[in-house]
A protein has these predicted regions:
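Phosphate/adenylate-binding glycine loop and adjacent helical scaffold
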Residues: 1-139, 172, 245
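Hydrophobic, aromatic-lined core segments that form the binding pocket/scaffold
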Residues: 110-123, 127-147, 155-215
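Short helix-adjacent coil turns
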Residues: 146-152, 235-242
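Accessory, usually C-terminal, subdomains that scaffold auxiliary metal cofactors
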Residues: 184-185, 190-238, 244-254
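Acidic, carboxylate-rich catalytic segments that either coordinate divalent cations
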Residues: 228, 240-294, 309, 316
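Cationic, low-complexity basic patches in intrinsically disordered or flexible, solvent-exposed regions
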Residues: 304
């Protein structure tokens, strides 16, 4: 059933309770998303798909109400889950400096990306953002709360940040997801990740979009899209500057501003992992699950996407 319609995507609630986003083929690489054959000039989804519509796929054609299109890729976007708890601390510090320099140069100045320089100064020089930048200040508060290790302070930080911003995935949520990617991959912040999952489960639907709530839960569980995973590999494996630049540029192209905001979060997560204070308060044993995350198998029943009409034998 359709539960949210935007210009370039609509959201579908499947029987398992999972949300899948169906996109115009514009290069989005969000976990739990698939692409249609439509292009940028295609008819906006909100002109032809409506809340509550049934959705199904049969013979490679996606249909909803009076709308139908051929699928360009009938699989979910590739997803990964990986932990590298023994990453070299010196390499991590060196790579995060390189990452910060490249992000400052190539990040998009949209959404919270407009405050990219201020965010980097906060992370590396402890210069607090001005009160006028409310979302950035809230993110800085959450960063310090995670570093403190105090549960109630972290909850207060989540209350200030989750859902802050506009769009399919609000800016603050994208930054939090990026933090989660770094913390999980480098075996840190297990208690924060667990707390975030519990918080989103209890309050997410009232504080942010349904899609963003799902992305927060996936990120807290270590699930990331392929471009972000490749970027994390560059940081962990001491990749040369040219390689990191190419990988970063692919990551920041995600969405209007989400790619840059995810990278801002990844940088913050790396800073939490690499500082001595963070090692005393937020680093715990790495997650047990590691390796490629077979989201297609888990959510798509042998890679058949969106089996959403159990009453229709054509969909079985």
């Amino acid at each position: 059933m359709v539960i949210g319609v935007y210009r370039k995507c609509f959201n579908v609630l499947v029987d398992s309770g999972t949300i899948v986003s169906v996109f115009v083929n514009t290069g989005y690489t969000m976990p739990m998303s698939i692409h249609t054959s439509l292009n940028e000039g295609g008819e906006p989804f909100f002109d032809c798909v409506f809340e509550g519509d049934d959705v199904w796929i049969s013979g490679g054609v996606l249909t909803s109400g009076g709308f139908a299109c051929i699928m360009s890729d009938a699989l979910l976007q590739e997803m990964h889950r990986c932990a590298i708890p023994e990453a070299d601390a010196d390499i991590l510090k060196k790579q995060q400096l390189l990452f910060a320099s490249l992000l400052k140069k190539h990040g998009k100045r949209r959404g919270e990306g407009k405050n990219l320089e201020r965010w980097i100064k906060f992370l590396f020089e402890e210069i607090v953002p001005p009160p006028s930048e409310k979302i950035l200040c809230s993110l800085a508060y959450l960063f310090e709360a995670i570093r403190s290790g105090d549960e109630q302070t972290v909850i207060a930080g989540l209350e200030r940040t989750v859902g802050a911003g506009i769009g399919l995935t609000p800016s603050a949520d994208d930054v939090i997801c990026g933090m989660c990617h770094a913390l999980y991959m480098f075996g840190a912040g297990r208690e924060f990740l667990s707390l975030l999952r519990s918080y989103v489960k209890a309050f997410g639907r009232g504080r942010t979009t349904l899609v963003s709530a799902q992305q927060l839960k996936l990120s807290a569980g270590g699930v990331m899209s392929d471009p972000v995973f490749r970027l994390m590999e560059c940081i962990a494996q001491n990749a040369p500057e040219d390689t990191m630049r190419r990988t970063l540029c692919k990551a920041v192209e995600y969405g209007s501003s989400s790619g840059t905001e995810l990278c801002m979060g990844v940088l913050a997560g790396c800073c939490l992992v690499s500082t001595e204070a963070a090692r005393q308060t937020v680093c715990f044993a790495a997650g047990k699950e590691s390796g490629n995350y077979d989201g297609q198998k888990e959510f798509c029943d042998k890679k058949q996407v969106l089996r959403l009409c159990p009453s229709d034998e054509a969909c079985r």
